[in-house]
Amino acid sequence: MAGRDAASNQLIDYKNSQTVSPGAITTGNGAPIGIKDASQTVGPRGPILLQDVNFLDEMSHFDRERIPERVVHAKGAGAFGYFEVTHDITQYCAAKIFDKVKKRTPLAVRFSTVGGESGSADTARDPRGFAVKFYTEDGVWDLVGNNTPVFFIRDPILFPSFIHTQKRNPQTHLKDPDMFWDFLTLRPESAHQVCILFSDRGTPDGYCHMNGYGSHTFKLINAKGEPIYAKFHFKTDQGIKNLDVKTADQLASTDPDYSIRDLYNRIKTCKFPSWTMYIQVMTYEQAKKFKYNPFDVTKVWSQKEYPLIPVGKMVLDRNPKNYFAEVEQIAFSPAHLVPGVEPSPDKMLHGRLFSYSDTHRHRLGPNYLQIPVNCPYKVKIENFQRDGAMNVTDNQDGAPNYFPNSFNGPQECPRARALSSCCPVTGDVYRYSSGDTEDNFGQVTDFWVHVLDKCAKKRLVQNIAGHLSNASQFLQERAVKNFTQVHADFGRMLTEELNLAKSSKF
């Protein structure tokens, strides 16, 4: 059909793929239904009977179709594919996924916006989630990142407040520029991420023209038990491509599902998107001498000092068979690690180790890892966790549900023990506020001076001013003060743009 894309033809494709006649409609318990288009009533105009179990079955299930929306990253797209190792990194990491060149590991990916609801526009100015689930022989490994290498805050205790400011005002239920800019200007460590957000990369052209980053610092352990710090990068093989402000705004109204559609159509037409994975590594000794806190997620590691090391390629070659089953129910958690990969002292990472799994248990139930898309199907689950709502397995039959035991229960894994690193830690227990004690602007200055050209600087300032001009005057002044600390030209240009915006409103 001319003028229709692959996504528009999904139902036609489904019909054409069926090789047998359609079966009978059934109830949820499998009983065939003879009449589907009428309720059971007393006479043609009479009331519906309580014994109409077909209606009760249909309506009671419909009433429960929606599950809680993700509190962040609600709007997203998913796809499946594989990761293939192209370069040997076993000197750094003993995880089985990397144990030989040309090895392929199946994976699932979910891309998303962050602040919007599930019906919001794909082209909104927002960071993009970039989460990868690797189904390895050592269990599921989730690398849960974004399309930016940094984040707004470095202490997880501020995360709920930060997200509240990105959502809606509790009284007006409107997006509130005062909330948005009040928090960000009071937390100057956000300046790095804010500048990336309001740069051209804040509105990527779909999900396939953006990079992905693990963002956090992790520890890799090799077969000798030697640890090293690392960061993960995914560079798009399609090339970076962004939407200008006018196009992004136009698509928000004409095709709010633009990015979901683009990903689906690429895969359906066999134009499989791919990304190349790289790592940066830093020894413990280098970390001690690093000019910044190497575990600060508001900063990057210089690629000149810590060059990118190629690892492999991620290819997406299958669309979800059902969105709810394989995308809405997919659950990523930074706590899903495998032997050879461990957390670093990154505080934001530590907060996410708890919160992601916790929110999945709320949203999907305590046995969410039994949902097929989340199940570590390459290994047999053997532990001492039992029961719980919606346990749909054999519940590990009659195996002992305690440890240690004398009755042939599962034992500790020597390999996993050998790949557990020992990390000496000393210090005084206290609540250390880092808002003003760290360098919050040095790397942002580098971004302004060395990354952005003249035109990109102008667009960044215009994008910030367009949003900031809707905030209260004192918040505009505070923002200008912060950005002036990045660079005097930045503050001057922003002041000029805000004055232009102010005059245009009168």
UniProtKB/Swiss-Prot annotation:
Pfam families with a match to the protein in the record: Catalase, Catalase-rel
Superkingdom of the source species: Eukaryota
Residues that, per the record, bind heme: Y356
Cellular localization per UniProt: Peroxisome matrix
Catalysed conversion reaction: 2 H2O2 = O2 + 2 H2O
Keyword Membrane part of the UniProt annotation: no
InterPro entries: Catalase, Catalase_3, Catalase_AS, Catalase_clade1/3, Catalase_core, Catalase_haem_BS, Catalase_immune_responsive, Catalase_sf
Residue numbers annotated as active site: H73, N146
GO cellular component, one term: cytosol
Keywords: Heme, Hydrogen peroxide, Iron, Metal-binding, Oxidoreductase, Peroxidase, Peroxisome
Motif Microbody targeting signal, residue range(s) on this chain: 504-506
MF GO annotations: catalase activity; heme binding; metal ion binding
EC number: 1.11.1.6
Cofactor dependence: heme
SMART domains in the record: Catalase
A biological process from GO: response to endoplasmic reticulum stress
Top EC category: oxidoreductase
Keyword Iron belongs to the record: yes
Subunit text: Homotetramer.
Protein function: Catalyzes the degradation of hydrogen peroxide (H(2)O(2)) generated by peroxisomal oxidases to water and oxygen, thereby protecting cells from the toxic effects of hydrogen peroxide.
Family according to the record: Belongs to the catalase family.
Protein name, per record: Catalase
Annotated organism of origin: Drosophila melanogaster
Lineage, top ranks: Eukaryota, Metazoa, Ecdysozoa, Arthropoda, Hexapoda
